[in-house]
A protein has these predicted regions:
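Hydrophobic, aromatic-rich membrane-embedded alpha-helical segments
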Residues: 113-136
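Transmembrane alpha-helix boundary signature
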Residues: 54-65
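Helical transmembrane-bundle signal
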Residues: 14, 18-21, 46-53, 127
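Structural signature of hydrophobic alpha-helical transmembrane segments
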Residues: 5-14, 81-85
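N-terminal signal-anchor/start-transfer transmembrane helix
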Residues: 9-31
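Short aromatic-rich membrane-water interface segments that cap or initiate transmembrane helices
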Residues: 1, 69-83
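Loop-to-helix transition at the N-terminal end of transmembrane alpha-helices
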Residues: 30-52
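Alpha-helical transmembrane segments of polytopic integral membrane proteins
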Residues: 16, 92-99
């Protein structure tokens, strides 16, 4: 297995999936399928490749007990690629969850697009921004109901 090739293919697949999440509401007949594939099938596929890479490379003299041990893991190209797939899979899954929750909450998709971009680039920051938006959105809805 070539870590560089896996890195490029996985990154491309994740990018296409993020684009799918962004445009899915605008392609109505395909929307549920796009969200299923982009939000669940692709992250699971990335997870499978992650597990295979870890199994193929072992712990390579590293571990998770210290920054030094993690650095030794990341010095191995196959494990660095596995780490990248970890980010891709979880961030994409979180992005799909955000899109799903925002739809349930009635948040307009145009408000969601910057949050998806933020989650794509900076994972936890996008999740945090979504929680802030969710609080503001629910407060706004409550105020409308009381008016």
């Amino acid at each position: 297995m070539n870590p560089e090739l896996i890195f490029k293919l996985a990154s491309s697949l994740a990018l296409v999936s993020w684009l799918g999440l962004a445009v899915s509401p605008y392609c109505a007949p395909w929307s549920p399928r796009v969200r299923l594939v982009a939000g669940y099938v692709v992250p699971l596929l990335l997870a499978v490749v992650y597990v295979v890479l870890f199994a193929a490379n072992g712990m390579a003299g590293g571990g998770f007990g210290s920054i030094d041990a993690v650095q030794r893991l990341m010095a191995v190209p196959g494990l660095l690629t596995a780490g990248w797939l970890h980010y891709l899979a979880f961030d994409l899954f979180v992005g799909a969850w955000i899109a799903e929750r925002a739809g349930v909450m009635g948040v307009p998709h145009l408000l969601l697009l910057p949050l998806l971009a933020l989650t794509f680039m900076f994972g936890p920051a996008g999740l945090l921004a979504f929680y802030v938006l969710g609080l503001l959105w629910s407060r706004r809805k409550t105020q409308r109901l009381q008016a």
